[in-house]
Swiss-Prot record:
Biased composition (Basic and acidic residues): 355-366
SUPFAM superfamilies tied to this protein: Calponin-homology domain, CH-domain, Glucocorticoid receptor-like (DNA-binding domain)
Ranges where the bMERB domain occurs: 661-808
Keyword field contains Zinc: yes
Lineage per the UniProt record: Eukaryota, Metazoa, Chordata, Craniata, Vertebrata
Name of the protein this chain belongs to: MICAL-like protein 1
Length: 853
């Protein structure tokens, strides 16, 4: 016969030619000993097995070796069982043909020189066609041996393994799935709990016999609600069975293995490589994962920081949102500035506030700056409780009270001003003033940046507008005032009456604790945020004028100088424009500097005052770091800087902000999309199985020879299509598992960082044990991800090669005219058409008419 069966038989003969003990006379008994399968595998992949070591008498081992190698290495699912091959003297012809056709699909395109090019083309183009393609005119004679009658004769014959081990129902060829030497319906081999497709080596026996459970349960991948129809139906009602199976068919098809083994059968795979999965909203097992991937990927370090930060901006400023997230919880309840109790972001002098979406690390101006501005503007620095006649603590007063002095009380009656340095456990404040503990929390103190670094920046001077309220440090009110001045960011140029030195001094005397207030430097506001934001609080101007008057008084000047080391003039650092935090707490120094100059009683202070104000404003608009000090103040600033010379604080060690990194592959597929595509594949597989059962019945029931050839072509094509769908389904399951591993890796890494963030001296034995466990788990996760990635890459490579071979075949001279339309479709041309074409060719080309007989 010149049909597909003859072509397949001829191809097998050519592949096994020259191998001892292998004689291909038909597509049934000739394959019983398993040597023919091994010979085909060895010819194309001699590295997979040692043919010379095989014995013709060892039927079971030969077949077992061939089936296992084909499944694991080539992704060809085993439709046959070694025990059946041993028990039957004449194996089922249709089963052999179906199984060998997959070898043909896989190898024909890349077959040895012995295989003709036309054959190769056919092979790749369609699994069914493979049978017909290989046969040469001379080969057809032998192909006839397997007459159509053989199939019908075997129609009633059922192999011993045709019963499903799970549901005890008959299993048709198109439904077969072999696992651990047992036969199952494809839809029966699924996880009992989550109904997802079982992957090779990733399942264990369930509580009941014949059931299986995933090694690791994932969000349900199988089609929703379909798992219930698990039991197979009796073979007789094929349609019913298929329908039921269709519903049941979740994904437990042999494909998982095939995928792992890298199925290369048909080029079709290439389009599937990573097709866009139908976006079908299903069970969003990990919605967060899906949503976050885009953002997390781009951000190098702070990918996941945003998650943790749930900013609640007290006073939304243009940029406060960013800082809020970054801010660490402030000591005082009110101290919690916009920022959440988030780990301090790495200070970045300038960043675009847009990063706020990624709250993790404010890239713009130091988040502390924004935060400070937002809150401090509204709330003046709290005056020392004793002397401050200003508004009650609860009251936020930006306006200057008592002669223009900013006396607004702290937000709350909190006596402790938030000390950013103190809050940062790890980093001692580089604050210029050695303030003992946080005094009444100045509103701005709350915004203290998360990290001591932040407090360190002298640039903040423009920032502290509200601070103008004199804090009477024990050293001198002037110092307090100066520090305030440096920090204070003149809300407005409104010249409020200079603070009277008396008021200052009285306040200073009354408030010894004010020193502390002074010490907590206000977080410098980023230049990007205009100082203008703060309503023109006369406090700043008042403080400036106060400074001048104080400086004239002279007595205060010295104390301020003493403090100078701590408070190196903020101007100097600003002039440097250093992006990093300037020397510790030089901000306070700004005020002192003018004071020192004033000490000479020169009127410079007042000009200085105005200039600082202007500078402050400008600095708000521009980056404070780049701001240049006013000429009058610069000398003193320089001196102060030299004197205090606060060293830049070292990068935070244990206090480094913890960011949950999102581990994600480049091609992320939302979980809902994976579920949707798997549902679609399941429906297609159900339909194919339904057709396959009916087709198998017809083939076994007996049909005329001409009709049988057409049916065989359809059969091979159907088997191949099923194989491709199963492969894609398996790939999706691997992708889903990979994404779960990625999520788990992110969690483990974050937990490990949290552990390592703790000073080693504070570690307990439990911490050390936990570290080892986490490290081991991390290594395991990475290895598992690597294995899946390698497997998927191999599959993709093989599919690309198949596509290339298919294209080459289509262009072959012999098929150019006939297959030109198909060639345009690349892998999508009709298999049946090509097979028929080949059959006609064979008739016209045959050199020996006698070959047919």
């Amino acid at each position: 016969m010149a049909g597909p069966r003859g072509a397949l038989l001829a191809w097998c003969r050519r592949q096994c030619e020259g191998y001892r003990g292998v004689d291909i006379r038909d597509l049934s008994s000739s394959f019983r000993d398993g040597l023919a399968f091994c010979a085909i595998l060895h010819r194309h992949r001699p590295d997979l097995l040692d043919f010379d070591s095989l014995s013709k008498d060892n039927v079971f081992e030969n077949n077992r070796l061939a089936f296992e190698v084909a499944e694991k290495e080539l992704g060809i699912p085993a439709l046959l069982d070694p025990n059946d091959m041993v028990s039957m003297s004449v194996p089922d012809c249709l089963s052999i043909m179906t199984y060998v056709s997959q070898y043909y699909n896989h190898f024909a395109g890349s077959g040895p020189a012995g295989v003709s090019s036309p054959r190769k083309g056919l092979v790749l183009s369609s699994p069914p066609s493979e049978a017909s393609t290989p046969a040469d005119p001379g080969d057809r004679a032998q192909g006839e041996e397997c007459s159509s009658g053989s199939l019908s004769k075997q129609g009633s014959h059922r192999t011993p393994s045709s019963t499903c081990a799970a549901c005890q129902q008959h299993v048709h060829l198109v439904q077969r799935y072999l696992a651990d030497g047992k036969l199952y319906h494809r839809h029966c081999f699924r996880c009992r709990r989550c109904s997802s497709t079982l992957l090779p080596g990733a399942y264990r026996n369930g509580p009941e016999e014949g059931t299986f459970v995933c090694a690791e349960h994932c969000a349900r991948l199988g089609p929703s609600g379909r798992s219930g129809a698990r039991p197979g139906t009796p073979p007789q009602p094929k349609q019913q069975q298929l329908t039921e199976e269709a519903k049941e068919v979740e994904g437990g098809s042999p494909s998982p293995k095939a995928t792992a083994g890298a199925e290369a059968d048909v080029p079709k795979a290439s389009p599937e490589g990573r097709p866009q999965v139908p976006t079908k909203p299903r069970v969003p097992g990990r919605p967060q994962e899906l949503a976050s991937p885009p953002a997390s990927r781009p951000t190098p370090a702070p990918r996941k920081a945003s998650e943790s930060t749930a900013p609640t901006p007290p006073t939304p400023r243009p940029r406060s949102s960013l800082q809020q997230e970054n801010l660490v919880e402030q000591g005082g309840g009110s101290g919690l500035v916009n920022g959440k109790l988030q780990e301090p972001p790495i200070p970045k002098p300038r960043g675009t506030p847009k990063l706020s979406e990624r709250t993790p690390a404010p890239r713009k101006d130091p988040p502390w700056i924004t935060l400070v501005q937002a809150e401090p503007k509204k709330k003046p620095a709290p005056l020392p409780p004793s002397s401050s006649p200003g508004p009650p603590p609860g009251q936020e007063g930006r306006q200057v009270e008592n002669g223009g002095v900013d006396k607004a009380a702290p937000r709350g009656p909190e006596p402790k001003p938030y000390n950013p340095f103190e809050e940062e456990e790890e980093e001692p404040p580089a604050a210029p003033s050695p303030a003992p503990g946080p005094a009444p929390t100045p509103p701005e103190s709350t915004p203290k940046s998360l990290h001591p670094w932040y407090g360190i920046t002298p640039t903040s001077s423009p920032k502290t507008k509200k601070r103008p309220a004199p804090r009477a440090p024990s050293t001198s009110p002037l110092t307090l005032h100066a520090s305030r001045l440096s920090r204070s960011e003149p809300p407005s140029a409104t010249p409020s009456p200079a603070l009277s030195v008396e008021s200052l001094s009285s306040e200073s005397s009354s408030q010894a604790p004010s020193e502390e207030l002074l010490e907590p430097p206000v977080v410098p506001k980023s230049s990007s945020e205009p100082a203008v934001h703060a309503p023109g609080t006369p406090g700043t101007s008042a403080s400036l004028s106060a400074n001048s008057s104080l400086s004239s008084s002279g007595e205060l000047v010295q104390p301020s100088m003493d403090r100078t080391p701590q408070a190196s003039p903020g101007l100097a650092p600003n002039s440097r424009g250093s992006p990093g935090p300037p020397p510790a707490k030089p901000c306070s120094g700004t005020a002192p500097t003018p004071l020192v100059l004033v000490g000479d009683k020169s009127p410079a202070p007042s000009p200085g005052t105005s200039s600082p104000q202007l500078q402050v404003k400008s600095s708000c608009k521009e980056n404070p770091f780049n701001r240049k000090p006013s000429p009058t103040a610069s000398p003193s600033v320089k001196k102060a800087t030299k004197g205090s010379k606060p060293a830049r604080p070292p990068a935070p060690g244990h206090g480094f902000p913890l960011i949950k990194r999102k581990v994600q592959s480049d091609q992320y597929i939302p979980e809902e999309d994976i579920h949707g595509e798997i549902d679609t594949i399941e429906r297609q597989l159900d339909a194919l199985e339904h057709r396959g059962v009916l087709l198998e019945e017809k083939l076994r029931g007996g049909v005329n020879e001409g009709r049988e050839d057409d049916m065989l072509v359809d059969w091979f094509k159907l088997i191949h299509e099923k194989h491709l769908l199963v492969r894609r389904e398996s790939e999706l399951i691997y992708v889903f598992k990979q994404q779960n591993l990625e999520q788990r890796q992110a969690d483990v890494e974050y937990e490990l960082r949290c552990l390592l963030n703790k000073p080693e001296k504070d570690w307990t034995e439990e911490d050390r044990g936990r570290e080892k466990v986490l490290m081991q788990e991390l290594v395991t996760l990475i290895e598992q991800r690597n294995a899946i990635v390698n497997c998927l890459d191999e599959d993709r490579q093989r599919e690309e090669e198949e596509d290339k071979m298919l294209e080459a075949m289509i262009k072959k001279k012999e098929f150019q005219k006939e297959t030109e339309p198909e060639g345009k479709k690349k892998g999508k041309f009709k298999t049946m058409k090509v097979l028929k074409l080949l059959g006609n060719k064979r008739d016209t080309k045959s050199k020996c008419p006698g070959d047919r007989s």
